[in-house]
């Protein structure tokens, strides 16, 4: 189940929304499944694309603070774009992708990339990466959603995570108008 939280309401001040999100994730109850059916916590944090750098800076600060041992949880930050690029590089697909796009077009390359990454499957490369790299007692931040579009769409990530990934609350950050 994907839910919103009071910091997801429309507010004019992004800094205030980020402050509210930061306070919320630091509460012990945030890491507990507390819904009607004891579902995992999935949260969406949308922001105007022009505020991307401010959001990135806040996430970096939170991660650095967390790495210093300031919290009683681990903050696991994953950039979905970086996961996709790393996969393509490890398989030596990057140059092939560039050539394929030149010959067949962008729409065809998005389809071609989604097949080996299993974007539509519960065992997608992204879900597997998140499962393998998320420690116990963690909060997961998903970033890079805007950079992946339209190759990978955020709802596919959430659908796949909902089926296969239940050990940590997930906060997905994505730019939206």
Where are the model-predicted features located?
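Mid-core helix/loop region of P-loop NTP-binding domains shared across ATPases and GTPases
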Residues: 122-134
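Long, charge-dense
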Residues: 75-123
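Conserved Walker B catalytic segment
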Residues: 149-165
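Conserved P-loop NTPase "ATPase switch" module shared by AAA+ and STAND
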Residues: 135-151
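Short acidic, S/G/P-rich loop/turn micro-motifs used as interaction or catalytic elements
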Residues: 49-54, 83-85, 116-121, 146-150
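Short, flexible loop segments at boundaries between secondary-structure elements
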Residues: 162-177
């Amino acid at each position: 189940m994907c839910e919103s939280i009071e910091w997801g309401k429309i507010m004019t001040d992004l800094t205030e929304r980020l402050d509210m999100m930061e306070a919320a994730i630091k509460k012990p109850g945030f890491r507990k499944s507390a819904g009607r059916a004891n579902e995992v916590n999935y949260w969406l944090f949308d922001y105007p694309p022009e505020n991307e750098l401010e959001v990135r800076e806040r996430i970096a600060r939170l991660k650095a603070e967390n790495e210093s041992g300031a919290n009683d949880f681990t903050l696991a930050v994953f950039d979905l774009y970086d996961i996709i690029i790393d996969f393509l590089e490890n398989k030596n697909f990057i140059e092939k992708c560039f050539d394929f796009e030149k010959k067949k077009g962008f729409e065809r390359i998005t389809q071609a990339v989604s097949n080996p990454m299993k974007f539509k499957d519960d065992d997608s490369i992204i879900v597997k990466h998140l499962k393998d790299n998320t420690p116990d007692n963690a909060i997961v931040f998903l970033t890079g959603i805007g950079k992946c579009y339209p190759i990978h769409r955020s709802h596919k990530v959430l659908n796949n995570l909902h089926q296969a990934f239940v050990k940590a609350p997930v906060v997905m950050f994505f730019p939206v108008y």
